[in-house]
Amino acid sequence: MLKTYRGKVVVSLAGATVTCLGFLLFLSQHQRIQADGMQNESEVGLRSLQSLGDSETDDGAQPEQNAKKGFSAYFSKLTRSRREADKPSEAPGAATDAPPAEDISADDIFIAVKTTKKFHRSRLDLLLDTWISRNMRQTYIFTDGEDEELKKKIGSHAINTNCSAAHSRQALSCKMAVEYDKFIESGKKWFCHVDDDNYVNTKTLVKLLSNYPHTQDMYIGKPSLDRPIEATERLGDNKMRPVNFWFATGGAGFCISRGLALKMSPWASGGHFMNTAEKIRLPDDCTIGYIIESVLGVSLTRSSLFHSHLENLQQVSKSEVHKQITLSYGMFENKRNIINMKGAFSVEEDPSRFKSVHCLLYPDTPWCPPQVAY
């Protein structure tokens, strides 16, 4: 019986040994395949680097120099790629054929126009005669002084913020704080801010915003910088930390969904907006970007359909004017910066070109000359 038991033990040990050897053989083969694959990938990467070096050096250069240049070009390319990846996502064009995410009308939009009393006649009257005349119900003018003539034209939508008339970050942030609170009170779906040197095409604005549910976190506009802005956040107790974020320039206009605006409340409602602006010591539009991107972690959605006087407006094609959402005017590199278009009026009669743009979009306007060729 003892012999039988020993025989069984020997058989079991032999079987286990064979199984173990088989597993080790399989593992060895698998590791060899992985190593070969890694070697192939390394060779492909090295060839890519070498090709970069070869393409950028002369025939007489040393191999070591080629490799250095190859690595330098490779990592420069990586840096550019990362920078591109960090840029805000692009909004679809307003004329997209995709079905709207939400059916909205101009009445769902709260358009805030920031101005100052000294520009009521020179800038604001032009807007009242053009695009605001078609959008009285949607437009609210935020200024810093009483104006009975303005009230006669737009009634309670002329809002005296009682903020300073200075063009300081505190005064600008004061007006933005009032804009935000009035929007929340309105119950409208979208908040859009523009300046008193912007023409707003509400038709294309409605088309763009209809691509997104107003309950979704949306921050849409155009940066004036080609990189995130760098700032210092003051944390209290003399502690500070660096922050960087994208922001949409207020000079081109930007829009915020109601869903996102409500989330901004702890940092924007009441007097909180001005306190937040002081934390980073930057103007109103930068503070909006700080709250949305740096605090709430929502990315800016870039749209090329918004335009400010900070860009070369001559580059806006005449044939594309009707597709834009906002336009502007001013000076660029010491030259008149306006939309370059043949319109209903001469440049002397219409230096901003807003009247000509308006007659292009609304030829039935009583003061527009009939049958104008654009």
Curated annotation (Swiss-Prot):
Residue numbers marked as site, Cleavage: R83, E84
Residues noted as binding substrate in the record, renumbered to the chain: R123, D196
Tissue localization of expression: In the embryo, expressed along the A-P axis of the neural tube, within the lateral plate mesoderm, in the presomitic mesoderm and the somites, in specific rhombomeres of the hindbrain (even-numbered rhombomeres) and in the otic vesicles.
Chain residues that bind Mn(2+): D197, H309
A matching Pfam family: Fringe
Catalytic site: D285
Ranges in the topological domain labelled Cytoplasmic: 1-8
Main location: Golgi
Subcellular location, record wording: Golgi apparatus membrane
Membrane topology, Lumenal segments: 30-374
Cofactor(s) the protein needs: Mn(2+); Co(2+)
EC number of this enzyme: 2.4.1.222
Membrane protein topology class: Single-pass type II membrane protein
Known catalytic reactions: 3-O-(alpha-L-fucosyl)-L-threonyl-[EGF-like domain protein] + UDP-N-acetyl-alpha-D-glucosamine = 3-O-(N-acetyl-beta-D-glucosaminyl-(1->3)-alpha-L-fucosyl)-L-threonyl-[EGF-like domain protein] + UDP + H(+); 3-O-(alpha-L-fucosyl)-L-seryl-[EGF-like domain protein] + UDP-N-acetyl-alpha-D-glucosamine = 3-O-(N-acetyl-beta-D-glucosaminyl-(1->3)-alpha-L-fucosyl)-L-seryl-[EGF-like domain protein] + UDP + H(+)
Glycosylated residues in this chain: N40, N162
Record protein name field: Beta-1,3-N-acetylglucosaminyltransferase lunatic fringe
Source organism per UniProt: Danio rerio
Gene name for this UniProt entry: lfng
